[in-house]
Curated annotation (Swiss-Prot):
Gene behind this protein: purM
Enzyme class: ligase
The organism of origin for this protein: Pyrococcus abyssi (strain GE5 / Orsay)
Record protein name field: Phosphoribosylformylglycinamidine cyclo-ligase
Catalytic function, reaction form: 2-formamido-N(1)-(5-O-phospho-beta-D-ribosyl)acetamidine + ATP = 5-amino-1-(5-phospho-beta-D-ribosyl)imidazole + ADP + phosphate + H(+)
Pfam family, one: AIRS
Top-level taxon of the source organism: Archaea
The family this protein is said to belong to: Belongs to the AIR synthase family.
Biological process according to GO: 'de novo' IMP biosynthetic process; adenine biosynthetic process
Length: 334
């Protein structure tokens, strides 16, 4: 049995270590008090800066150790998509339309072919998300970096009065999940350390090599979510990233009662190799990359809209059991 913490990613330890940085960051808010760009609070998927009639939303994220898989097989043309996806999907969670992005690419040494492949993925991701890449930083640091690191910072815009934070979520609301493309960009450290030493990257599983499962690009949800929020009342939006279903606790203190889709593909292989079910749902997206919460009366229209883009599921409902996320069909409470 291997857990995420045993693989080297202890999220509780990280949260404790971050407390001082978050406290200090909040102290800087007073520097913009009463000025254009005054920030809201820290903690949601994206920060909100006050620009009068609208908020500028801002977020930052990276691809993580998925880059190590790309490096191992010499295939870098999809990690740019991952970086765009990780950022724009977070912007969507406050109801913002993504506008632009800057990238940060740290390397041991410049390689023209690698740069060309990364650029290809960045363009494809930007095209899907409808954003402009307006700048960036390439850092060549042979004494610090042993391979590659790719991250970015994105901005979006949302009108005041249209911000979605989860505060309107109520017991009885419907919970809808949009399918993921696979592992996305979270839990790769656990997946790599569990599977690669045992099988190797060329291992065939259900018709695909292991590296193909691991490098499948993160799905970009901009089109379905923007269509949704312009069509129905939406109470909450959650990008299911690191922490799995625990991300729902970022939206509300209310509980959730869900039935998740069957465990398939890469998640099935990981579970079969000893990762317990509760850990699976705490680490991976488990086939659902994005979750929306809508009033019951909006459920059918929401499902119709989302299903036009990607396979979507009616997962369950919001409950009055504070802080409890129940996955009924697997007998798990998170």
């Amino acid at each position: 049995m291997l857990t995420y913490a045993q693989a080297g990613v202890d999220e509780e330890k990280t949260a404790r270590a971050l407390r001082e940085i978050i406290r200090t960051a909040r102290e800087t808010f007073k520097l913009r008090k009463g000025k254009v760009g005054e920030p809201g609070d820290i903690g949601h998927y994206a920060a909100l800066l006050d620009f009068g009639n609208f908020y500028l939303a801002m977020t930052t994220d990276g691809v993580g150790t998925k880059v190590l898989v790309a490096e191992a097989v010499g295939k870098f043309d999809t990690i740019g998509i991952d970086m765009i996806a990780m950022n724009v999907n977070d912007l969507l969670c406050v109801g913002a339309e993504p506008l632009a992005l800057v990238d940060y690419f740290a390397v041991k040494e410049p390689n023209e072919e690698v740069f060309k492949q990364v650029a290809k993925g960045l363009y494809k991701g930007a095209e899907e998300a409808g954003v402009a890449i307006v700048g960036g930083e390439t850092a060549v640091m042979p004494d610090l970096i042993n391979g590659y690191d790719l991250a970015g910072t994105a901005i979006g815009i949302v009108e005041k009065g249209k911000v979605i934070t989860g505060e309107r979520i109520r017991p009885g609301d419907s919970v809808i999940g949009i399918s993921s493309s696979g592992i996305h960009s979270n839990g790769l450290t656990l997946a790599r350390k569990l599977l690669i030493p045992k099988y190797g990257l060329d291992y065939e599983y259900e018709g695909r090599k292991l590296w193909e499962w691991l490098l499948e690009p993160t799905r970009i949800y901009v089109r379905p979510i923007l269509e949704l929020i312009n069509s129905v009342e939406v109470h909450g939006l959650a990008h299911i990233t690191g922490g799995g279903l625990l991300n729902l606790k970022r939206l509300t203190n209310y509980g959730f009662e869900l039935e998740m889709p069957p465990i398939e593909g890469i998640f099935k292989l990981i579970h079969e190799n000893g990762v317990p079910l509760d850990e699976m749902f705490r680490v991976f997206n488990m086939g659902v990359g994005f979750i929306v919460v809508v009033p019951q009366e909006e459920k059918e229209e929401a499902l119709e809209i989302l299903s036009r883009h990607y396979k979507s599921y009616e997962l369950g409902n919001v409950t009055r059991e504070l802080g409890k996320i129940k996955v009924k069909n697997y007998g798990i409470t998170l």
